[in-house]
Every structure is written in structure tokens, then in C-alpha cells.
A protein has these predicted regions:
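Conserved beta-strand scaffold positions in the cores of enzyme catalytic domains, especially
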Residues: 30, 101-103, 157-159, 246-248, ...
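Residues at the starts of beta-strands that form the adenosine-phosphate
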Residues: 7, 52-54, 100, 127, ...
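Positively charged, low-complexity intrinsically disordered leader regions
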Residues: 2-8, 280-287
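Alpha-helix/helix-capping structural signal
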Residues: 14, 60, 135, 213-214, ...
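Catalytic-core segments of class I nucleotidyltransferases/pyrophosphorylases
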Residues: 129, 148, 152, 181-284
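N-terminal glycine-rich phosphate-binding loop and ensuing alpha1 helix
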Residues: 2-80, 106, 142-146
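Residue-level signal for inorganic ion chemistry
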Residues: 39, 65, 119, 134, ...
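Conserved beta-loop-beta/alpha segment of the NTase-like Rossmann-fold superfamily
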Residues: 75-78, 92-177, 219-222
Length: 297
């Protein structure tokens, strides 16, 4: 049986340029879907999967991210004094246990693989998860929990996967797999951002990984790949070449690309509609706006 996965890396060093000017002063990961930051969705998912140690790979200007996970005793005291117990519990749920969270700087933006490599000393020789907060996945059972349960049966490396339109393959790492509709599929190869004509399939890697320490050893070589960056996909592909098993996991859930404005807005609406106190007002507004927009077009 493989070792338990208790550590997760969160690469959050990006500049968030697609959300300027907001991200001039606010880290993208702190931007909220309804009333919870993007990064909180990732943390909650990780906790549900049994993660105990949280490693953030950051860059300059991410101080608000660290502050968010810090305790706020003055605010807690004020809420307690005013009897706002429900809000107090919401606030306390964002607190992290002492020693459970670490921050590592990525001094140069050299790619996702490089960001993961920056955390190597905190991972050691253990299997670990990588979670990209931009990918928010709404699921009855959290995506990483689904993967951990599958990983405990397979070992090796595992990546979350979903089918994308052929014209979208150039935006993703794409898996070369045998034709199969199973949730867990054996991966024969991986290609980073291929043109549709060169893509071995339309099964794309999404921002959830469970990886073995051998991937970190591959990243030690610091080979440049697509876009001149150190690609995590390439390091996983090296394991495949050495017959280390790699699996794609078709998760149950809906993925939102919150690195794009349209995906962020879609996620905001979807999560708001799940909230009983917001649903009716929002639906009433949508039912008013959508017909008028359609008529105008």
C-alpha cells in the first residue's frame, strides 16, 4: 500500500495579469467567489483529502495571502463581544494550525515545474499533492479526496483529467492513453500544450496532482520545455519513460477555470446559486436580465 499523502504544494506565485488592475494590490488567490477566496476552496478540498501540511510557493506582493491564514484575535474578540457567533466560527475556520503552513519564494517565474521544485526540501521522500487554486472544482466528494482514494489502490503518480474540445488542447497538458471510459486510466505519455493535430487525445490534465518524489528528482535537471519554462508535465513524462506508473483520473465534478474572467464569473454564479440565502434574489435578477439582453441582441 502506498504511503499516505499528507503534504500539498500550492503554486501561487503568478502575477494574475488577466485580472488587472485588481491584482495590482490584491493577490488573485484572495479574490472571492461570493465570500470565500479562491485559495480557501483549495484548502478546504485539501483538508477533506487528509492533507496536514500546506506549502505555498509565493512571490513578491503576496503578503495578503499570508495575512489571510493568520489568526485575527482582535477581530475574533470583537465578534465574540457582539454575539456574532456564526461569523466567529466562519472566521475561525480559516485559521491554520501552528506549523501546518509554510511559504517558499519562487524568485523567478520559470514555470509550474520550477514552482513545485522550489518546495522540494519540505517534501523530502514522501508522495505529495499539487493543487492549482485557479482550478475550482465543485463536487459532492471533493476532487482530491476522490484521487487519494484511487491512489491508495494504484500508487505511482496520478493527475486529474477531463475531456476538452479539440481546439482547446493547446491550452493544456494532454494525456496519451488507451481508449477507455474508466475513471482511472493508465497513461502512456504526456504532451504539453500540443496543437489539435498533434494531440494524442483530448484528455487534459487539470490542476490536481498526486506525485511521487521521483518527479522532484526529474525536476532537479531543470530542463526547459514548452514556452522555455520548466514544465511539470515533462517531469511526469520522464517517470513514464522509466516505467513508473502514471494514471489519469476522470473526476466527478464541475471544473471552473478561475484564471479567466469568464470562468471566474461562471463560478461565482454557480456557487451563489448553491446558497439558500442568495438563490432566490439572484435567480430573480437573472430572469430579468437575460431576456432583456437577448432581446437587445
Amino acid at each position: 500500500m502506498p504511503r499516505k499523502v499528507t503534504k500539498a504544494i500550492f503554486p501561487v506565485a503568478g502575477l494574475g495579469t488577466r485580472f488587472l488592475p485588481a491584482t495590482k494590490s490584491v493577490p488573485k488567490e484572495i479574490m472571492t467567489l461570493v465570500d470565500r477566496p479562491l485559495v480557501q476552496y483549495a484548502i478546504d478540498e485539501a483538508r477533506a483529502a487528509g492533507i496536514k501540511e500546506f506549502i505555498f510557493v509565493t512571490s513578491r506582493g503576496k503578503g495578503a495571502l499570508e495575512d489571510y491564514f493568520d489568526h485575527a484575535p482582535v477581530l475574533e474578540q470583537e465578534l465574540r463581544k457582539k454575539g456574532k457567533d456564526e461569523l466567529l466560527e466562519v472566521l475561525k475556520s480559516t485559521n491554520m494550525d501552528s506549523g501546518a503552513i509554510a511559504y517558499i519564494r519562487q524568485h523567478k517565474a520559470l514555470g509550474l515545474g520550477h514552482a513545485v521544485w522550489c518546495a522540494r526540501r519540505l517534501i523530502g521522500d514522501e508522495p505529495f499533492a499539487v493543487m492549482l487554486p485557479d482550478d475550482v472544482i465543485a463536487a459532492e466528494k471533493p476532487c482530491l479526496q476522490q484521487m487519494v482514494e484511487a491512489y491508495e489502490e494504484t500508487g505511482g503518480n496520478m493527475v486529474a483529467a477531463m475531456e476538452v474540445a479539440p481546439e482547446k488542447t493547446s491550452s493544456y497538458g494532454i494525456l496519451d492513453v488507451k481508449d477507455s471510459n474508466d475513471a482511472v486510466v493508465s497513461v502512456n505519455g504526456m504532451v504539453e500544450k500540443p496543437k489539435s493535430a498533434d494531440a494524442p487525445s483530448n484528455l487534459a490534465v487539470i490542476g490536481r496532482y498526486i506525485l511521487s518524489p521521483s518527479v522532484l528528482n526529474n525536476l532537479n535537471k531543470r530542463k526547459q520545455g514548452a514556452g522555455g519554462e520548466i514544465q511539470l508535465t515533462d517531469a511526469i513524462a520522464e517517470d513514464i519513460a522509466r516505467d513508473v506508473p502514471v494514471y489519469g483520473y476522470r473526476f466527478n465534478g464541475r471544473r471552473f477555470d478561475c484564471g479567466s474572467k469568464s470562468g471566474f464569473l461562471q463560478a461565482t454564479v454557480a456557487f451563489a446559486l448553491e446558497r439558500a440565502e442568495l438563490r432566490d434574489d439572484l435567480m430573480e435578477y437573472i430572469s430579468t436580465v437575460v431576456p432583456s439582453r437577448s432581446a437587445a441582441e
